[in-house]
Amino acid sequence: MVDIIFHYPFLGAMGDHSKKKPGTAMCVGCGSQIHDQFILRVSPDLEWHAACLKCAECSQYLDETCTCFVRDGKTYCKRDYVRLFGIKCAKCQVGFSSSDLVMRARDSVYHIECFRCSVCSRQLLPGDEFSLREHELLCRADHGLLLERAAAGSPRSPGPLPGARGLHLPDAGSGRQPALRPHVHKQTEKTTRVRTVLNEKQLHTLRTCYAANPRPDALMKEQLVEMTGLSPRVIRVWFQNKRCKDKKKSILMKQLQQQQHSDKTSLQGLTGTPLVAGSPIRHENAVQGSAVEVQTYQPPWKALSEFALQSDLDQPAFQQLVSFSESGSLGNSSGSDVTSLSSQLPDTPNSMVPSPVET
């Protein structure tokens, strides 16, 4: 709030305020003392010249026709303050208007069109589950895919072709580099890794059996050999890999459950916050800072002129006082002129005596 305070030290001889001395008002803008007829005071203790109260960005004068804001001792018009310090969309970095509907994810605010998964670009609707990872939105499917890749130890490795699943078989040896075998004609033999590709029918059969019994016996494995046409070794290795993968996933889920108290999930640098999208809400441009309202003010003698028209004041003496104030010659006149002029005025009610500047 900006208060308009009239600064007239020569009126100190009128009424009960004759014993008060005007304080020294210093302008915050230029740092000099204010000798104007009125000063602008920004609550609580910032005082300005009328010519110094302007926007620090565009130098627009701030008066009763606009709203201004104060931040770090600087004044801004509303347009520049919203542009510099207003809330912007976390996706497109564009500001909001008062009529925009927004989506919120913790401290981030998004346009409805910008509230999309950063991987598949699918728009997140109210009720959809998503996660917030490093200020990026992820839908539930893509977030689960990242967790599975991280659990498998290859976060960004390309997957197999659609419709076929790969199965890696371990080496027959101990995993060390093949050595020379002198007992076989002194020739080097290199072990090769066989890659077996399973079709959808074989994979469905193995998964159904695994769901019923993760550790099938020999009889069950023989039946699987007949049903799938795979070798016993391939079936044995598939069950081993499946159990190992499920064990890693179980350990991961336990780690996630232990961190639910902080609503965060983490895995090898992969951090995210599970959230549920709510309904769009109307954006309220709650900019930080103190709003400043510059009030309109009247000329210093307007109220006194209106009072004179409705009272029995001596008109010649009053007109002389008004013309004397407007000519600005009072500052160069002597103290005897002020005394003789004030003696011609009738007693003025205390309610009409302007108060000096409060410091």
From Swiss-Prot:
- Residue ranges for the DNA-binding region feature of this UniProt entry: 191-250
Residues annotated as coiled-coil are: none
Subcellular location(s) of the protein: Nucleus
Q: Which terms under GO biological process does the entry name?
A: axonogenesis; negative regulation of neuron differentiation; neuron development; neuron fate specification; peripheral nervous system neuron development; positive regulation of transcription by RNA polymerase II; retinal ganglion cell axon guidance; spinal cord motor neuron cell fate specification
Q: Which residues form the signal peptide?
A: none
Q: Name one Pfam family in it.
A: Homeodomain
Q: Does the keyword DNA-binding apply?
A: yes
Q: Where is this region: LIM-binding domain (LID)?
A: 272-301
Query: What cellular-component terms does GO give this entry?
Result: chromatin; nucleus
Which keywords has UniProt assigned to this entry?
Developmental protein, DNA-binding, Homeobox, LIM domain, Metal-binding, Nucleus, Phosphoprotein, Repeat, Zinc
Database matches in Gene3D superfamilies: Cysteine Rich Protein, Homeodomain-like
- What name does UniProt use for this protein? Insulin gene enhancer protein ISL-2
Q: Which organism is it from?
A: Homo sapiens
